[in-house]
């Protein structure tokens, strides 16, 4: 049964500026080391950062809340399976929230076109 859905759209040019400025402290606050390594290895890293940020926002919207009760941006991580499909990996407070809500699966879809990155998250429970 679907528990919640969330969608977020991000202007990639915001992340273009952040990458150009080398705003490492902000990236370290928003992304896990694994996410930063993945994005930095891409030709247009700002696009990949924007997609991951949109996915984190979409997850919070699907849950019906924002960052609170000690949850951090690192608690929601975007990883790729062996075929390259994006998945959400939950840690800390996000994992506890998923357990408390009896979530059984998370689905994430990422896309980009021109200056925009979009993420859709669907949360399911039994």
Swiss-Prot record:
Domain of life (superkingdom): Bacteria
Pfam families: ACPS (PF01648)
EC class (word): transferase
Major subcellular location class: cytoplasm
Keyword hit for Magnesium: yes
Catalytic reaction annotation: apo-[ACP] + CoA = holo-[ACP] + adenosine 3',5'-bisphosphate + H(+)
Binding site for Mg(2+): 8, 57
GO biological process: fatty acid biosynthetic process
GO CC terms in record: cytoplasm
Needed cofactors: Mg(2+)
This enzyme's EC code(s): 2.7.8.7
Family: Belongs to the P-Pant transferase superfamily. AcpS family.
NCBIfam families assigned: acpS (TIGR00516), pantethn_trn (TIGR00556), PRK00070.3-2 (NF000832), PRK14656.1 (NF011250)
Its biological purpose: Transfers the 4'-phosphopantetheine moiety from coenzyme A to a Ser of acyl-carrier-protein.
UniProt-recorded name of the protein: Holo-[acyl-carrier-protein] synthase
Organism per entry: Geobacter sulfurreducens (strain ATCC 51573 / DSM 12127 / PCA)
